Every structure is written in structure tokens, then in C-alpha cells.
Amino acid sequence: MNLNSIPAFDDNYIWVLNDEAGRCLIVDPGDAEPVLNAISANNWQPEAIFLTHHHHDHVGGVKELVEKFPQIVVYGPQETQDKGTTQVVKDGETAFVLGHEFSVIATPGHTLGHICYFSKPYLFCGDTLFSGGCGRLFEGTPSQMYQSLKKLSALPDDTLVCCAHEYTLSNMKFALSILPHDLSINDYYRKVKELRAKNQITLPVILKNERQINVFLRTENIDLINVINEETLLQQPEERFAWLRSKKDRF
């Protein structure tokens, strides 16, 4: 299997998996044009689309792609049923695509119906988990997002985290504002800064490394707890997550 990223809009990535035969899976095609260009350039044959949630920058290209390739099966959560989804999937179910089983993981928070797809080592996590950050809470609660991230963080160390946006540099600036002396965060920030200066992608990331540099996955880390305790005493990890998310919203 080959993993490909297609830039779209200002900072979106549309992920495409293809096999040796050229069959492909498309994830969150917010815009059809760059996908169609990539299909033509690589002689891919689209078999399926995965949708993680209903926001337009993730579903906007579905209609045009299905019109061009009517054989495509469109998988998505209930909230995408009016966005072109032909096969609604929910937590605990599997989607069998390109000879691989993808587990569906419910990850409410960014939206209430958000889902992710996992087939080792690939995690397509939409707007739930970003490198160095997590999605804004447009519909869900901090508690829901905390639990969603906990699920994803428990996946195997070698998981490739395929996020839907290039937010890594801004996320790491925020992480440095919280833990300015953390060696892992400083090292990763320098690496990301160099990549972005060359207009290079920072994704996918390996989950084992992500756990070290993403403050939203470190709510039980003593250094982070000490920082938060300087401002307010919060006993539960979920409360510390909510504090971080509120800080990031204002950053």
C-alpha cells in the first residue's frame, strides 16, 4: 500500500491509499479538482471514499467524484448521510477496502458524529487529532474530546497519524508557550519549523513520537500538571484537558 497526501485549500490534506494494482481509497475529499488531477496523473481507480465528519472542507468534493466514478462506495458517519455517504458506519464496525479491514472509531468532540478509521499502521483521524494539537470543539464537550483522544493514543506505537490539516507549526508554538523548557517539544518545534520553511509537509507522524510532544496527550504528565497548578488546581485529567483547550482557543 502507498500513502499519498494531496494538498487542498489553504491547509487541508486529502489522503489517498493505493495498492499495486492502482486501486485507491480517498479520505475526506473536500475538493474534487486536486483529487481528479492526482487520479489522472497516477492512473488510479477509485474504489472508496472515507468521510470522518460533515464539515464542507472534508466532504465538498464527494458529489463530483461520485459523478465521475459511480462505482465508488462512500463510507461515513450518520452525520454525513446527506453529504453523499452510501454506507453509514459506526463505532466498532469495519470497512473492508483494498483488501484491508479498517476499524471505525467514534471520536466525538470536533463534531458529535466524528469518526476515525484505523488499519495498522494507518490512522485517518480527520479533525480529532493533529500533530501537536487537537480539533476545536464545535459541537462536542471537552470530556468527549478527551475520551476520543485517549482512544487514539492507545493505538499501537507505530501508528501513522494522518491528520487532515497542516497545523503542526502553530500547534508547537502553543506547546512551547505551555512547556517552554521541554526538550522533546523544543526539538520537534525546530524540525517542524525547518520543514515548513521549505513548504514541506509535516505529516504523517508516528504515534509514539506524538505522545511525547502533544500536550493534549500529556494531561497526566507531572511537568504539565505543575504548570497548570500555578494557575489553578485541577485534579482530573479531563479538567486539565479542558484548561488546555480553552488556552489554545485564545492563543
From Swiss-Prot:
Q: Can you supply a Gene Ontology BP term from the record?
A: methylglyoxal catabolic process to D-lactate via S-lactoyl-glutathione
- Mind listing the UniProt keywords for this protein, alphabetically? Hydrolase, Metal-binding, Zinc
Tell me yes or no: is Cell division among this UniProt entry's keywords: no
Q: What is this protein called?
A: Hydroxyacylglutathione hydrolase
**Record's cofactor remark:** Binds 2 Zn(2+) ions per subunit.
Q: Which Gene3D superfamilies match?
A: Ribonuclease Z/Hydroxyacylglutathione hydrolase-like (3.60.15.10)
Belongs to which family? Belongs to the metallo-beta-lactamase superfamily. Glyoxalase II family.
Species source reads Escherichia coli O81 (strain ED1a)
User: Lineage of the native species?
Assistant: Bacteria, Pseudomonadati, Pseudomonadota, Gammaproteobacteria, Enterobacterales
- Is the keyword Hydrolase assigned to this protein? yes
Which positions does UniProt annotate for Zn(2+) 1 binding? H53, H55, H110, D127
The coding gene here is: gloB
